[in-house]
Amino acid sequence: TVDSIRPMPPAELATVHGDPPQPSPAFGESVLLAELSEAAVAGFLDAALAPASGALLSVELRHLGGALATDVPGDALAFAVGVVPVPEAAPEVAAAAKAFARALDPHAAPRAMKNFTERPGEPERIYGSDLARLRTIVAAWDPEQVIAAGHPVLD
């Protein structure tokens, strides 16, 4: 349980979740859940407790609300991450995270949440109906794609 709700100065905001202060080698997968139903919660728990999930550091179920409720077509987000301490551990950690995400496919929304999409690909799932407009803007104003983005909109 992460319980870090308290008054704090802006300099401490990065500590709220307890992530390491420096980048860490890891592999993660996320699934935007269409609704936070009993079946989706049961699917999350089954995936989290599956033997393959032993390679994961943590799994999270995040309720989405506030401003996200108007722009993100889902009720919750499931996220799994595993640390990759040595390169040899990468295949096992990646397989565990992918298995976790696949187990939640029956409950998945058609879109993905950009902040939790670890690797580029499938811009349609990230940007939805905004993709055509974004492509037009980027093609007109940055055709050489000088402005780097983790999730490019042009092919």
Locate the predicted segments by residue:
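Soluble FAD-dependent oxygen oxidases
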Residues: 1-155
